[in-house]
């Protein structure tokens, strides 16, 4: 489908690399939306941000987590990637460890040097990490990370069937709830680490900040994205979740569409739900799905309108796959 917006994007010269302005949200698949709403509000302390039929968003610390039912797409039962991490301080690390236990959520606390960490999953299987880089007094009691000489982490054991009617039923309403400080990172699987590093730095404008032993981190628009070839999975070919959304300002939106296409990235058409916001989907070379989101752009009046919003534009997610130079 050709639109005025797509033609305009293709005509923009790439004289200056456009930039994302921040991370908008991380949208995850879930098995049961009602169960997930209970988990993200009660256990994760999320604040309801947006809800429509079949989709809900919670604000947790400084990030929005979206949820929608899908047949698969969460972290594999034995996998470490993808996972999503939150910062918290030492006091809240201890509180959160006890909080997860009270809500019958299996978890694995461990340490890497002076950083205390906990892995756990939501009821669907999406893997989360808590990250406390200082101030946890009980750090010496935690087992070492596997790559520091500790035991292997049994990620399969962290899967569970959540009895949300029972879990947390005995919690004193006056008990202090843990607080997460900020979103720390999203760590994603990639098939080719060198290729992924080039894509995230050269195309998405990220800064390589860590690179060791099959794992790298790139800071993009203030958010850390981890990249690894260790066991994991990407967004499925025909799936919308998980996906990772970056903000773009109005002046950068169409230039970014052009920039992505000029760098060999297959994208959807710029589209809109309401004639005000601008949206675009694309994948990294491994297949992880990303969204570009502009809160308000005049050009949206000419963008294709989504079919669910009364328009005739349907996204072909499978068509976003492409081969990028390795």
Task: State where each predicted segment sits.
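Hydrophobic, helix-prone linear segments
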Residues: 1-64, 71-72, 184
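Vicinal oxygen chelate
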Residues: 2-17, 23-31, 59, 75-99, 102-179, 262-326, ...
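Conserved short beta-strand elements that form part of the metal-binding/catalytic scaffold
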Residues: 4, 47-80, 90, 127-134, ...
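Conserved small-residue-rich
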Residues: 29, 40, 174-219, 223-225
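Conserved active-site tyrosine of GNAT-family acetyltransferases
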Residues: 36-41, 100, 125, 196-201, ...
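Conserved acetyl-CoA-binding loop of GNAT-fold acetyltransferases
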Residues: 42-48, 105, 203-208, 265
């Amino acid at each position: 489908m050709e639109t005025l917006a797509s033609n305009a994007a293709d005509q923009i010269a790439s004289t200056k690399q456009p930039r994302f302005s921040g991370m908008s949200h991380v949208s995850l698949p879930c098995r049961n939306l009602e169960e997930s709403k209970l988990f993200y509000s009660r256990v994760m302390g999320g604040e309801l941000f947006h809800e429509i039929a079949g989709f809900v968003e919670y604000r947790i610390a400084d990030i929005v987590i979206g949820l929608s039912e899908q047949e698969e797409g969460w972290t594999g039962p034995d996998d470490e990637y993808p996972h999503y991490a939150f910062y918290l301080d030492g006091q809240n690390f201890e509180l959160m460890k006890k909080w997860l236990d009270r809500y019958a959520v299996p978890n694995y606390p461990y340490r890497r040097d002076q950083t205390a960490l906990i892995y756990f999953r939501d009821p669907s299987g999406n893997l989360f990490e808590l990250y406390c880089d200082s101030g946890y007094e009980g750090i010496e009691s935690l087992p070492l990370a596997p790559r520091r000489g500790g035991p292997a982490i049994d990620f399969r054991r962290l899967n569970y069937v959540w009895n949300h009617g029972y879990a947390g039923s005995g919690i004193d309403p006056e008990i202090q709830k843990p607080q997460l400080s900020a979103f720390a990172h999203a760590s994603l699987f990639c098939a080719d680490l060198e290729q992924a590093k080039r894509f995230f730095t050269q195309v998405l404008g990220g800064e390589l900040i860590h690179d060791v032993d099959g794992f790298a981190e790139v800071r993009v628009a203030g958010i850390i994205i981890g990249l690894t070839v260790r066991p994991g999975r990407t967004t499925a070919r025909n799936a919308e979740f998980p996906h990772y959304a970056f903000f773009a300002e109005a002046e950068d939106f169409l230039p970014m569409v052009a920039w992505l296409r000029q760098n060999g990235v297959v994208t959807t058409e710029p589209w809109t739900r309401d004639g005000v916001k601008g949206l675009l989907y694309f994948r990294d070379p491994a297949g992880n799905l990303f969204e570009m989101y502009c809160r308000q752009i005049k050009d949206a009046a000419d963008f294709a309108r989504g079919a669910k919003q009364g328009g005739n534009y349907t996204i072909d997610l499978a068509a976003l796959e492409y081969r990028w130079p390795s």
